Swiss-Prot record:
It holds the Pfam family Ribosomal_S2. Gene3D superfamilies: Glucose-6-phosphate isomerase like protein, domain 1 (3.40.50.10490), Helix hairpin bin (1.10.287.610). GO terms for biological process: translation. GO terms for molecular function: structural constituent of ribosome. Belongs to the universal ribosomal protein uS2 family. It comes from Oryza sativa subsp. indica (Rice). This is Small ribosomal subunit protein uS2c. It is found in: Plastid, Chloroplast. Keywords: Chloroplast, Plastid, Ribonucleoprotein, Ribosomal protein. One of its GO terms (cellular component) is plastid.
Length: 236
């Protein structure tokens, strides 16, 4: 994997609050190598380590994107839902931003069936096939379609398991990380001071609670994916 320069700026990270961790009583001792100080009862993340692992993650996704690999971005915090969707769409990635259903990847055959039903319902609605049905049936189908859109809309074009999964909140998306580990899917995860850095293939030490921090990290990764996609298009 070739190392590249991703313009990861220390001042920019400080302004975004990437370095702010949790209170010292909530920490995970496994994060000790990634913590540089304690300030007013709060752990401070070592931004030199953040820079290193964010750079490694950017290199990984760039190389994968340049080979035409697929990505899934997972972030189901309510405040981050729109950010996850817009970033994923920009980089042509799949995404889950509402709720992670247990077995979404490990029971892929079931997920694939639901996605097929979802696509069929969308096609029928677009072709106005619902108009020939009784009103009660139309209402039921529209409710079902709305639910499928809400929870599966971000993966509606996913026809196989993703090659790399990016997770924005390790603790909230623990089940997603475990499913990836079972299936051997490489993962990249933000790791706040209360997290376990061993749960992902690349853990980026960073504040996973503040929107400015999440946005900065996600934007760097998405930029690297877009650059890799451009190279793939040029070579094919």
């Amino acid at each position: 994997m070739t190392r590249r320069y991703w313009n990861i700026n220390l001042k920019e990270m400080i302004e975004a609050g990437v370095h702010f961790g949790h209170g010292i009583k909530k920490w995970n001792p496994k994060m000790a190598p990634y913590i540089s100080a304690k300030r007013k009862g709060t752990h401070i993340t070592n931004l030199a380590r953040t820079t290193r692992f964010l750079s490694e993650a950017c290199d990984l996704v760039f190389d994968a994107a340049s080979q035409g690999k697929s990505f899934l971005i997972v972030g189901t915090k309510k405040r981050a839902a729109d950010l996850v969707a817009s970033a994923a769409i920009r980089a042509r990635c799949h995404y889950v931003n509402k709720k992670w259903f247990s077995g979404m990847l490990t029971n892929w055959s079931i997920t694939k069936t639901r996605l097929s039903q979802f696509r069929d319902l969308r096609a029928e609605e677009k072709m106005e096939k619902f108009h020939h049905l009784p009103k009660r049936d139309v209402a039921i189908l529209k409710r079902k379609l709305s639910t499928l859109q809400r929870y599966l809309g971000g993966i509606k074009y996913m026809t196989r398991l993703p090659d790399i999964v990016i997770v924005l909140d390790q603790q909230k998306e623990y089940i997603a990380l475990r499913e990836c580990a079972i299936l051997g899917i490489p993962t990249i995860s933000l790791a706040d001071t209360n997290c376990d850095p061993d749960l992902a293939n690349i853990s980026i030490p960073a504040n996973d609670d503040t929107m400015t921090s999440i946005r900065l990290i996600l934007n760097k990764l998405v930029f690297a994916i877009c650059e890799g996609r451009s190279l793939y298009i040029r070579n094919h």
